[in-house]
Amino acid sequence: MLVSGCSISTNGFIMTEPDPISPSATNFIVSLVIMILIESLNWDKSRTILENSEDGNDRVESYCNSSIFKKSASISINFREYSAIRSFLVSSNNKMMESGVLSAISVNVSVLLPQRRILLSEVRSIPNVTGWSHLYSWKASTPISKETNRTLESSTACAMIPSSLHWKLTNWTQSLKPSIILLKRDASSNFASNIFSLF
């Protein structure tokens, strides 16, 4: 049985469809957070904290401006998947299969300094995925396991806006986008063992 779920959160409103079903289910949660904020010229500092612990989202934004009209929009997408399938049959075969957790975490930071410099930073971490299945039969036991990669991506960009042009044109831009793979491995093992046999 496969069950998919979608969760959308906008300014504190959470909607999840459909509800997860257990014990034999596959849950796939997509959490989309959209935040649009328009600052007036009288605002000096603004801080927004948005936390959605149910779907694994935690976003903190803090910025200040110096008499510059600013409009910012941010989108955060978080994926989390967990599947567990269990099947117990009365016949000679007894099958149980489980897979691990797959998640992608994105952190996006935007800072506007009084010297009219914009600093953008984004960090994305993808943990490794471990899945295993076990097939039990009357005469043999066969476990199968597989692991995938662990990846960490980071990108940083800085832009300076001259005072004469304010925020309309950009004079200097420098970006750095490294991608680091912390752990890269793709290993699978498969073996079978005879438990017992009758005449």
UniProtKB/Swiss-Prot annotation:
Localization, UniProt: Membrane
Cellular component, GO annotation: membrane
Domain of life, source organism: Eukaryota
Record's bilayer topology term: Single-pass membrane protein
Keywords assigned: Membrane, Transmembrane, Transmembrane helix
Transmembrane segments: 21-38
Primary location recorded for the protein, binned into one broad class: membrane
Further remark: Almost completely overlaps POL30.
Listed name of the protein: Putative uncharacterized protein YBR089W
Taxonomic path: Eukaryota, Fungi, Dikarya, Ascomycota, Saccharomycotina
